[in-house]
UniProtKB/Swiss-Prot annotation:
Gene: DBP3
Job description of the protein: ATP-dependent RNA helicase required for 60S ribosomal subunit synthesis. Involved in efficient pre-rRNA processing, predominantly at site A3, which is necessary for the normal formation of 25S and 5.8S rRNAs.
Residues involved in ATP binding: A173, E174, T175, G176, S177, G178, K179, T180
Highest taxon above the source species: Eukaryota
Name of this chain's protein: ATP-dependent RNA helicase DBP3
Native organism taxonomy: Eukaryota, Fungi, Dikarya, Ascomycota, Saccharomycotina
Length: 534
């Protein structure tokens, strides 16, 4: 009995049925097979999807290639079918007039040779220069203003076809050659018909005086077209300029003031379609390169860029290469070399510096009060002293230099233009770009720091096809510039005085980017010599 209870109450191991393990193994196997089947299906679908996508891309690529080939064939056919009476470009629809195309090539060659016109066209468009206003179709609101002039100037004739066509253009020509209308007419003409808002045309110039002059010329074009032109420059309060620029379509600005307005968030240049850099070489000389780069960076990347310059040095070439797209270069005369206007009679007198003011008074009385005379001093302090001397001598003189306010300078310039005063005294602030009509005589009281500035100074006379006189008082202090001056005189067919020849050839000073033209070039790798003081 006891043994039976022990058996009943003891631990007994209970084994699971065999068929339960088999069921579990079967389910696991089915689950695995199901998973593999699903993965296989997904892999197949993924492969089919990829093949379908590749097939679609292949077909699209094929269609695109066929479409391109068809388009090229069509264009080739159109070129073959086009008549020789016109030369056109599809970029903005400029079509060379049939009358211009009909002119004999000899007449075109004569114009190019007589005016020393050179066109470097990377697009090979082959546009002929516009010899008459009848050869160009301008908007009706602009044409009456332009046709008041007898005919286009050489820079206008050669550049207009490319500018109207929408190409980037570099114009290299002497000051007073009609450059403002060369870029102004195509720019205004091209924006009249569209309804785009905001600033459309931006012209950057190196000085306030030049900016105001360009503003006056462009206003002649914009006032009849329902467009507003404003001038932005330093020396006056910003408030009025900020207010005016909000409704403007055309802006003429000096780099410094424009950068100020950009930094203030007062002007938006993203809508600019036409960017003009006028007197580009002068702006680089004045150290505006970084400002120019900042300004250009704020404009529309699809803009048309125009650059006008009196000279074509390496720095200007590099600037053009950076910001312009396959620019057409139009040159009037040999602008790679420094050359003076051949219509100007140049006289150089070598003298004692102490005799200059006496000689100036003699020249002013000699040339009389019936013609406009422009006298150049080198520094503003000199200009102030000479102005006082001329007033004491009974001359009604107007003056523009750095010591005067912008209002005083503008008033003086206007007085000279109107003829209230026939004598203007200026420093080099007025030496470039200013279009002062009917200046007959330029007198260099003090020779400038460079022969380049000399050429720009005397370029104030002999403008727009007229003749002029340049009288220069030269001293021994400037003898290091005698050789370069003699080259300019000879190049323009002018006599070289014996006194100037006595200074001999010109040994060009070495120039350093940081230290200027008068530094001493030494080898910094050599050990310095010891100097003992007794």
């Amino acid at each position: 009995m006891g043994s039976k209870r022990k058996h009943e109450s003891g631990d007994v191991e209970v084994k699971k049925p065999k068929h339960d393990n088999e069921v579990k193994g079967k389910e696991k196997k089915e689950k695995k097979e199901k998973k593999e089947k699903k993965e296989k299906k997904e892999k197949k679908e993924k492969k089919e999807k990829k093949e379908k996508k590749e097939k679609k891309e292949k077909n699209e690529k094929k269609e695109k290639k066929e479409k391109k080939a068809k388009k090229e064939k069509t264009e080739e056919t159109e070129e073959t079918d086009s008549t020789v009476s016109t030369v056109s470009s599809s970029s903005s629809g400029y079509t060379q007039a049939a009358e211009l195309t009909a002119l004999p090539q000899s007449e075109i060659d004569e114009f190019l040779q007589t005016n020393e016109v050179t066109v470097e066209d990377p697009h090979k468009l082959g546009f002929r220069p516009i010899l008459s206003f009848d050869h160009v179709q301008l908007q009706s609101k602009i044409a009456p203003i332009v046709t008041k002039f007898p005919k286009p100037t050489p820079i206008q004739s050669a550049s207009w076809p490319y500018l109207l066509n929408g190409d980037d253009v570099v114009g290299v020509a002497e000051t007073g050659s009609g450059k403002t209308f060369a870029f102004g007419v195509p720019a205004i003409n091209n924006i009249i018909t569209d309804n785009k808002k905001g600033l459309r045309v931006l012209c950057i110039s190196p000085t306030r005086e030049l900016a105001l002059q360009i503003y006056d010329n462009l206003t002649m074009l914009t006032k009849n077209c329902g467009l507003t032109c404003v001038a932005i420059y330093g020396g006056v309060p910003k408030d009025q300029q900020i207010k005016a620029v909000k409704t403007a379509s055309v802006v003429v600005a000096t780099p410094g003031r424009l950068v100020d307005l950009l930094n203030d968030g007062a002007v938006d240049l993203s809508t600019i379609d036409y960017l003009v850099l006028d007197e580009a070489d002068r702006m680089l000389e004045k150290g505006f390169e970084e400002d120019i780069k900042n300004i250009i960076g704020c404009t529309n990347k699809q803009r048309q860029t125009l650059m006008f310059t009196a000279t074509w040095p390496k720095e200007v070439r590099e600037l053009a290469a950076t910001f312009m797209n396959k620019a057409v270069k139009v040159s009037i005369g040999n602008r790679d070399e420094l050359a003076a206007n051949k219509r100007i009679t140049q006289t150089v007198e070598v003298m004692d510096p102490r005799d200059k003011e006496r000689r100036l008074l003699q020249l002013l009385r000699q040339y009389g009060s019936d013609q406009k005379i422009l006298v150049f001093a080198l520094y503003k302090k000199e200009a102030t002293r000479v102005e006082a001397m001329l007033r004491r001598s009974g001359f009604n003189v107007a003056a523009i230099h750095g010591d005067l306010s912008q209002q005083q300078r503008t008033s003086a310039l206007d007085s000279f233009k109107r003829g209230d005063s026939n004598l203007l005294l200026a420093t080099d602030v007025a030496a470039r770009g200013l279009d002062i009509p009917n200046v007959k005589v330029v007198i260099n009281l003090t020779f400038p720091l460079t022969v380049e500035d000399y050429v720009h100074r005397i370029g104030r006379t002999g403008r727009a096809g007229q003749t002029g006189i340049a009288h220069t008082l030269f001293t021994e202090h400037e003898k290091h510039l005698s050789g370069a001056l003699m080259n300019v005189l000879r190049g323009a067919g002018q006599p070289v005085p014996d006194e100037l020849l006595k200074f001999g050839g010109h040994t060009k000073k070495k120039s350093h980017s940081a230290y200027g033209a008068f530094f001493k070039d030494v080898d910094m790798t050599k050990t310095a010599k010891k100097i003992k003081f007794e």
